[in-house]
Design a protein with these regions (language model features):
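N-terminal anchoring/stem segment of glycosyltransferases
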Residues: 1-68, 127, 158-159, 194-200, ...
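Short, solvent-exposed loop/turn segments at secondary-structure junctions
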Residues: 12-13, 43-44, 76-77, 100-103, ...
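Short amphipathic alpha-helical segments and helix-helix/interface helices
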Residues: 26, 58-59, 82-86, 148-155, ...
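Conserved beta-strand scaffold positions in the cores of enzyme catalytic domains, especially
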Residues: 36-39, 69, 94, 163-165, ...
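ER/Golgi luminal nucleotide-sugar-dependent glycosyltransferases, focusing on the catalytic module
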Residues: 47, 97, 111-116, 188-196
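Short, solvent-exposed polar/charged micro-motifs at secondary-structure junctions
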Residues: 47-50, 105-109, 172-181
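GT-A fold catalytic core of metal-dependent nucleotide-sugar glycosyltransferases
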Residues: 52-106, 110-115, 120-127
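Catalytic core and acceptor-binding pocket of nucleotide-sugar-dependent glycosyltransferases
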Residues: 123-207
């Protein structure tokens, strides 16, 4: 039988993100009959703190389910059945996409910068991964930088973590026009991130 994989996500309660979840990710998970665990969390006060909670949430879900989990942001849609997650060899601890920043935002193929994106990320349930995520939790409590930058730094420090690099089609981020970047074929996209945070990061837009 195929491995059981739990798809996880959260949203801030009493905020526009509840509607975002119910418009984007939740219907996608149901469409593809993917086992999922979605939780509402209390507002921690600002966008930085709410997004940094991702690390604690992933740890809680790993300990709760004791199975491989795939975290996907609330404003993502699953365009095609994400079969790759079942095909990744067991030896890999996490699976994540590294965005070619210059290609995404400057249409430049210089390949000078690659950023870990935590919008779509798979975690195996094992001791190495649990240790990594616990470090992620602790660092996000003291660092003021974006949680995915914290995770990138930790993975670079922990060479024993085996990382599977997801293709861009599993973490396709809309450009500033709200469109799929022209270097990606729309029909090949599996998971698309619609970037609702661009609007709702500013709380004046919550009304």
């Amino acid at each position: 039988m195929p491995e059981t994989i739990i798809y996880i996500s959260f949203f801030t309660s009493k905020s526009p993100y509840e509607k975002v979840m119910n418009t984007y990710l939740r219907p996608s998970l149901e469409r593809w009959n993917l086992i999922h665990d979605i939780q509402a969390i209390k507002d921690l006060g600002n966008w930085q703190k709410n997004t940094s909670y991702k690390a604690q949430f992933v740890l809680d879900m790993l300990l709760k389910h004791k199975k491989t989990v795939v975290f996907i942001d609330a404003d993502a849609t699953i365009e095609k059945h994400p079969s790759l997650f079942w095909e990744i060899p067991e030896e890999y601890d996490i699976a994540v996409h590294y965005q070619d920043w210059y290609k995404q935002w400057r249409n430049d193929n210089c390949g000078k910068r690659f950023d870990l994106l935590s919008g779509t990320i798979m975690f195996r349930y094992n001791e190495k991964t649990l240790s990594l995520v616990r470090k992620w939790v602790e660092r996000t409590k003291t660092f003021t930088i974006w949680e995915q930058k914290v995770l990138q730094k930790i993975t670079e420090e922990n060479k024993d973590i085996k990382i599977f690099k997801l293709p861009v089609e599993y973490c396709t981020v809309n450009n500033h026009k709200g469109e799929i970047p022209n270097y990606i074929k729309p029909e090949e996209v599996y998971i698309r991130h619609h970037q609702a945070s661009r609007k709702f990061r500013n709380r004046r837009n919550w009304k």
